[in-house]
Amino acid sequence: MSSGDLVLKWAWPNPEDLRNAELTSTRESGEFETPPADTIFVTYFFRFNHHTGRFEEAGRLDWYPSSERAGSVYFGERQVQMNALHRKNKPTSRSRRFKSNKGNEYKWKKGSDAGMQELDFVCVDSWRRVVGRWSNESQTLTMTSGGFAIFDELVVTLWLQIWRREKGFW
């Protein structure tokens, strides 16, 4: 870890419902919030705005009512299908790929495939440079400077990896 890295500590107020999470660090903070309702299948993600002193909506996940796997993710106005943020390159692949807003490809790999613990994840760019590391033990995402440009995408795709792993369909 370098001094320029950003470390986000994740906390789940209710560990039984991973759709609600709080992220904190000394520089940035955010949260995922799913309103408790039977008919609404939306998870919002917020980022703290240091200029206004408030959390502001950065996007949302619209879940299909019959599925915990599929839906649409909105990064501001840009819509992406959830499955596009969790693509396998080939049927036997143990990593999951996604494209950033700028068209660059990234992939999340299981920690055991990157010399880390089984429940950890590491995200690399197309040049195999690490842009983020998830430590399940400490519940932290360490983002390198290479991940700052895709902050929202990195946080949301990690959240989806954790969600899918816990639901048994990573």
Q: Residues of each region from the PLM?
A:
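Low-complexity or membrane-interfacial segments used for flexible interactions
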Residues: 1-32, 36-46, 92-96, 101-170
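A beta-rich soluble binding module of mature secreted/lumenal proteins
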Residues: 38-51, 55-60
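Helix-adjacent hinge/juxtasegments
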Residues: 56-92
